[in-house]
Design a protein with these regions (language model features):
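Feature responds to low-complexity, polar/acidic, surface-exposed segments characteristic
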Residues: 1, 11-66, 70-101, 106-145, ...
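Short, flexible, surface-exposed loop segments at domain boundaries
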Residues: 149, 153, 159-206, 211-274, ...
Length: 429
């Protein structure tokens, strides 16, 4: 849903919830389509018109329904309204929308008509939707009502579908940056500090951070993703479309090496000297050989591959180190637990394995670092079992320990007290 939130297509149902299992009315879907077409600024001009008898002046979606009904799509041979009523002058705005209706509306938004779909409705439109990838990943019959999550998937699919003219839809929404982009941080301040809600990316023309044209820049699910960024003529974000390269997220079991990294579980990944490394705190990437030393054991990275080769790496916290910039959670976590990391900030986001979680979902012994740029707590549950061998400066108050295999680890300040209870020869995790 964050792709659509960035575009202004959705905004949740209140309390910052998207409610993916909730149903969707015809009026709600119509509003989403208008926003998807980036026509929301035109809606107020249609508020005084009466097109459907049951979409009265008091209806919340009147302007959007009227705009959609007045928007003609198709080609020179056939023009159809984006939406139509039920045949008796009514629109039934509060009835739940079906899969067939939703697919038909989006196909029309892409410029298709009965010339391509045929005269049999809804099956002709459903077949056409399937052939262009519009219904990929959605299991619903033509007459089945759809959930908000299914509707969101339709819109996300539509971004990458070809329109009736053979052009990929998102490419016609604005200027597509020539290089694939990684979203480094979200909901950040603009360069001049005049506004918040910008998105910082790896591909910048005139600024480090872009504001969305219509939507919300607080899109944590997109942070660290790589894809195509589309801007309007004001250098505002119209949309972001993740690409189809393979993305693999791992936690490092040891320090990164000049030509490789090893993940928890022992799997090793090869890095080329020209593999690019990006962090949330930088606007430009580094070649792997120039930046790999910033990645220590416990760092979480996302690797992007093309044709079997890792071409880019993203690290949410950049210079993740095992020092006082991290906290081991020993009991129930509260905002106060991380006061030393955040400097007292309490409006942070919490992420674990690329998923947003709550403080109550952080478990004892989880390790938490803080990404100041993104105002995000990054949670890791990496566990390594080994034999404790020695400690410095003393076993009772260790700041550094050595374990079997000759490896050394710094001890977090928050774990000093608990580590003092162990002695050489103990098996520890």
């Amino acid at each position: 849903a964050d792709i659509l939130r960035l575009m202004g297509v959705v905004s949740g149902t209140g309390d910052d919830r998207f409610d993916p299992s909730g149903t969707l009315s015809r009026a709600q879907f119509c509003t989403m389509v208008v926003n998807f077409l980036q026509k929301q600024d035109d809606a107020p001009r249609y508020a005084t018109r009466t097109i459907f008898s049951d979409v009265k002046s008091s209806h919340w979606a009147r302007s959007y329904v009227n705009l959609a009904a007045s928007t003609m799509v198709g080609d020179d041979q056939e023009q159809l309204p984006l939406i139509s009523g039920v045949g008796d002058g009514r629109f039934l705005p509060d009835s739940q929308i079906t899969m067939g209706e939703a697919a038909t509306i989006l196909l029309r938004a892409l410029g298709y008509s009965s010339k391509q779909a045929g005269a049999v409705w809804p099956q002709g439109y459903m077949d056409l939707a399937g052939s262009i990838g519009l219904t990929d990943g959605i299991s619903a019959g033509a007459y089945s009502t759809i959930t908000r999550a299914q509707a969101a998937q339709l819109f996300v699919n539509a971004l990458s579908c070809k329109d009736a003219g053979g052009k990929v839809y998102y490419e016609g929404l604005g200027s597509v940056l020539p290089q694939k982009t990684i979203v480094l941080a979200v909901d950040v301040e603009t360069d001049d500090g005049s506004a918040k809600g910008a998105v910082r990316t790896t591909a910048n023309k005139t600024s480090e951070a872009y504001l969305p044209a219509h939507g919300d820049g607080d899109v944590p699910a997109l942070q660290g993703k790589r894809g195509h960024l589309v801007l309007n003529d004001k250098d505002e974000i119209v949309t972001f479309v993740p690409d189809d390269s393979t993305a693999t997220t791992v936690v490092l079991s040891g320090n990164a090496q000049p030509g490789s990294v090893k993940a928890a579980g022992g799997k090793q990944y090869t890095m080329s000297s020209d593999t690019m490394l990006y962090t949330s705190g930088a606007t430009e990437g580094k070649a792997w050989t120039d930046g790999y030393t910033d990645l220590s054991a416990g760092a979480q990275i996302t690797m992007y591959s093309e044709k079997g080769k890792v071409v880019a790496v993203y690290s949410a916290s950049g210079t993740t180190t095992i020092d006082s910039d991290a906290v081991v959670v020993m009991d129930h976590a509260t905002a106060a637990t991380f006061h030393g990391l955040t400097g007292g900030a309490t409006s942070f986001r919490v992420m674990k394995g690329r998923q947003t979680i709550t403080l109550s979902q952080i478990q004892p012994n989880d390790v938490v670092t803080y990404d100041q740029i993104g105002n995000t707590l990054m949670v890791s549950d990496l566990r390594l079992s080994c034999v404790y061998q020695n400690a410095e400066p003393s076993i009772k108050a260790p700041t550094k320990i050595s374990v079997s295999g000759g490896k050394e680890f710094d001890v977090l300040e928050s774990a000093w007290d608990s580590c003092g209870s162990f002695k050489p020869g103990d098996s520890v995790t």
